[in-house]
Design a protein with these regions (language model features):
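GIY-YIG nuclease catalytic motif and its immediate N-terminal context
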Residues: 1-55, 59-74, 80-83
Length: 83
């Protein structure tokens, strides 16, 4: 089983929000974020996946997710590279 870290961005161009998360099934998780069952921070917005990275171990994925959540500059660099 693979583990993914992903970055979501709002579809609404007026609010420039991003969200970093972890999942083993990114598409299913995106559907939850776009419904009322997503993380509290993502409710009320429609999201698209702009970045995902695959890992073989959960611990490496969680460590990378933590680093993206704590390092805004690193996250913004990835967002700029992905357009």
């Amino acid at each position: 089983m693979y583990h993914y870290v992903y970055i979501l961005k709002t579809l609404n161009g007026f609010t420039n929000r991003s969200y970093v998360g972890y999942s083993t099934n990114v598409i299913s998780r995106l559907n939850k974020h776009n419904s009322s069952k997503g993380a509290k921070a993502t409710r009320g917005y429609k999201w698209k996946i702009v970045y995902k990275k695959r890992f073989n171990s959960k611990s490496k994925a969680m460590s990378f997710e933590y680093s993206l959540k704590k390092d805004r500059k690193k996250r913004l660099t990835i967002l700029k590279e992905t357009g």
